[in-house]
Regions:
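Conserved N-terminal beta1-alpha1 strand-loop-helix module at the mouth
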Residues: 1-78, 82-85, 89-91, 259-283
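Short amphipathic alpha-helices and their capping/turn segments at secondary-structure boundaries
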Residues: 1-14, 48-49, 131-142, 230-238
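Short, well-ordered coil/turn segments that N-cap beta-strands
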Residues: 14-18, 53-56, 86-88, 117-119, ...
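Conserved, mostly hydrophobic/aromatic
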Residues: 20, 58, 93, 121, ...
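Active-site-proximal loop/turn and secondary-structure-junction residues that shape catalytic pockets
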Residues: 24-28, 62-66, 96-98, 125-127, ...
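Conserved anion-binding
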Residues: 26, 94, 98-194
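Active-site-adjacent beta->alpha loops and helix N-cap segments on the catalytic face
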Residues: 67-82, 99-104, 127-140, 200-209, ...
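A C-terminal functional module that forms or caps the active site or interfaces directly
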Residues: 199-246, 250, 254
Length: 291
């Protein structure tokens, strides 16, 4: 199966739009890292396994693995292999984008068949279409893309909302994404060339769905970033497909608010609660969870 088929099958079998962002953060005075006594891969895999019945995919944030050097990259390879063994779709949150030859190397690293191979990748469109061409080429071999269009962070509007001719810059990017994906629309009416649209900007999300009627929307912002379930499902179709909602810290670090402090147990409860809250929001909006 290709990326869209695998993702849709996972969503339907688990009745979910939820995915897990695997963000094993570095220890700071304000942010917890990996629990004491846990190897990095063990912590991530325990949370992934616990959340697996309630999520369609994982989205490892590569920076948190890269920051730990060789040990971190070995852990990333182990985490991806473990997730694939559970039948989960894997999305590399890499936000790559460079001149053609460099992008080709990134595409080989994360959309090829090596240690860090994933089903899809997040990419940065700032360098233009020639920089994204090597990634788009991988769609033909069954991979997926999520292009940064309107991101969830507070200062995203500094550039993304600037007025280009006749529309904001982010809308111009969305129109390009629609063009890149139009040749790959499959049986579900969805293209594997998707977009990242933050739930923290629901009005933008509604407009994005108009511009991207066939794209799968990767939705950050739910959970620790403060977006509501109602805002997070704006881009989902009536059948619940076409959108996946990410949560990272609220699942990875749910154990900090639990009585027993066990990462897996707390993550499972948080993932179930997330799935059910999003499904309630879908129904309230006149939509249905994926079935």
């Amino acid at each position: 199966m290709d990326f869209v088929e695998r993702l849709v099958a996972a969503q339907r079998s688990k009745h979910t739009v939820a995915i897990l962002g695997v963000d094993p953060q570095l220890d700071t005075r304000t942010t917890p890292g990996v629990p004491s006594g846990y190897p990095l891969a063990r912590f991530c895999c325990e949370v992934i396994e616990a959340c697996a019945p309630h999520i369609a995919a994982i989205k490892p944030q590569l920076a948190f693995f890269e920051a730990r050097g060789l040990d971190g990259m070995r852990a990333l390879a182990e985490v991806l292999k473990f997730a694939r063994g559970l039948g989960l779709v894997t999305i590399a949150d890499a936000k790559r984008g460079d001149i053609g030859t460099t992008s080709a190397a990134y595409a080989e690293a994360f959309l090829g068949d090596g240690d860090f191979a994933c089903d899809a990748i997040t990419i940065n469109p700032y360098l233009g279409s020639d920089a994204l061409a090597p990634f788009v080429a991988r769609v033909r071999s069954g991979r997926g893309l999520f292009v940064l269009v309107k991101t969830s962070n507070p200062s995203s509007g500094e550039f993304q909302d600037l007025e280009a001719p006749h529309r904001p810059l982010w809308e111009a990017v969305a129109e390009r994404v629609h063009g890149w994906g139009s040749d790959f629309i499959g049986a579900e009416g969805l293209t594997p060339v998707g977009a990242v649209i933050g739930a923290t900007y629901p009005a933008h999300a509604r407009r994005a769905r108009e511009l991207l009627p066939d794209s799968i929307i990767l939705v950050p912002g739910y959970g620790a970033q403060g977006a509501s379930a109602e805002d997070s499902i704006v881009t989902a179709r009536a059948d619940g497909l076409g959108a996946i909602v990410n949560a990272s810290r609220s699942l990875m670090y749910a154990y900090l608010k639990s009585s027993d402090g066990v990462p897996g147990t707390a993550a499972a409860a948080a993932a179930l609660a997330m799935r059910e809250e999003l499904n309630r929001a879908l129904r309230a909006a006149g939509k249905s969870p994926p079935t």
